[in-house]
Amino acid sequence: MKSKEVTAVLDQFHFQGQHWHARSVEFSDVTDWHNNLVFEKEIISYRKLGYRGNLLFAFNGEDNCGIFFLKEAPCSSVQLAYQGKDFLTDFGKFTVTGLGITEKDVTPDRWTKTYGCVLGIYGEDELSRLQALRSYQKNIRTYRADRDEMIMMNTWGDRSQDSKVNESFCLKELERAARLGITHFQIDDGWQIGKSPNSAVARGSFKNIWDNKDYWKPDPQKYPRGLHPIVKRGKELGIEIGLWFNPSIQNDFADWQKDAQALISLYREYGIKIFKIDGLTIPSKEAETNLHRLFNKVLEETDEAVIFNLDATASRRGGYHMFNEYGNIFLENRYTDWQNYYPYWTLRNLWMLSKYVPAEKLQIEFLNKWRNTDKYKGEAVSYTHLRA
C-alpha cells in the first residue's frame, strides 16, 4: 500500500474570514545561469494549494491588515529535503512547509536545526508590509559602517585569473584603486600556495585541500614578504585588504575547524577582515551545520570583526535569506569578454531584489565598459550608452 505523503510543517496560522489575499515571492540565485531573480505571484486564497518562495504576504481584504512569513532557507530550487512547495494557503489558513531535514538528520544526542521561519505583522498598504519585513532584516546582523560599507576592487575582474597576482601587481593596483576612491581591495584566487581548479598556471582542485597544510598561506614565489607590504600600503592609502577563500568541501565540510583556523590566522597575522567565500556546495544538513560552525567560530575568535562575502553565483548555497548574519552577498559574475555585461541588466537585478533584500547586503559589480567594445558592435543600441 502506498503511504500518504506527510507535509513537514515549519509554522502555521489559521485566521477567520473568507477574503484573504496573498503574494508569494520566489527567488533564484545560481546567477551564472539565471538573470531573472525575483518572481511574484498574486493570489486570492481559496482551497488548499501550494506555492514556492521564501516570502508569503497575506492580508485580509476586509480590513487590509496582514502578516508575512519569511522562510529563512536557500532558494526553493536548491533546498534540502524539498517537497515542491514552501507555503500552503487554504482560505484563512497559512502553512509554511519544508524543514530542510529528513528523519536521517535527527539523532537523540544533539539538537538539529531546521530552516527558520519569521512571522511579522503589517498595516494597510504596500509600504507597511515592506517596512515590517525590512525592520526584521535590519536586526539580523548589527550594522557597522566601518565594517559593512565598501567600494571593492577584486583582482579577478581583469580576466587573467591567477596568472598576474603577485606583490608587484597588487601594489600597482592599490595605487589605481586609491585614485578611483576604492575602499577595499580583494585579492581573489591565486594569492595562496594551493591551486584551485580555476588556476591558469597549474592544475588544482577544491578537494582534499588539507593534504597540503600550507594551502592557505601566501605563495612565497608571488609574495616573498607575505602579505605585509600589501597590507601596509593599503593602510597608507586608506584601503582595506580582503582575500578569497574556498572552504574544504569534501565530507560535508568535515575540516571546518581547520578552515576556521586558517581564516583566524590570516586575521591575526595580517588583520584581514574580509573574505570572499566561494565554491560552496551544501548537499546535506551536516554540510550546512558545519558551515554555520565555521562562520560562527571565526566571528567568535575575531570579536565579530570579520565579514564574509558569500558568493551566490553557482551550486547549492544559502541564497538571499540564509547566512545573512555573516555578511553580504556577492551577486553575479558578468564579463565584457563573454558579452554578458549590460549595466541595465545588473541594475534591474539590484532594483528587483532590493524590494525584499536590503540593498546594502548585495555586492553589485560595475565593470570597465570600455574593454571589449568590439564584442558589442552591431547591436541596435550602443553598449557604452546603455542605461537601466
Each predicted region: which residue ranges?
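Conserved, mostly hydrophobic/aromatic
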Residues: 109, 153, 234
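Short conserved micro-motifs at the rims of enzyme active sites and ligand-binding pockets
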Residues: 81, 125-126, 163-165, 320-321
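Conserved small/polar residues in nucleotide/adenosyl-binding loops
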Residues: 384-388
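N-terminal accessory beta-strand-rich subdomains and adjacent acidic, glycine-rich linkers
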Residues: 1-133
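Aromatic- and carboxylate-enriched substrate-binding clefts and catalytic-loop regions
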Residues: 186-375, 380
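An acidic-aromatic substrate-binding cleft motif
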Residues: 132-176, 180, 184, 188, ...
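Short, solvent-exposed loop/edge-beta patches enriched in aromatic
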Residues: 3, 178-182, 237
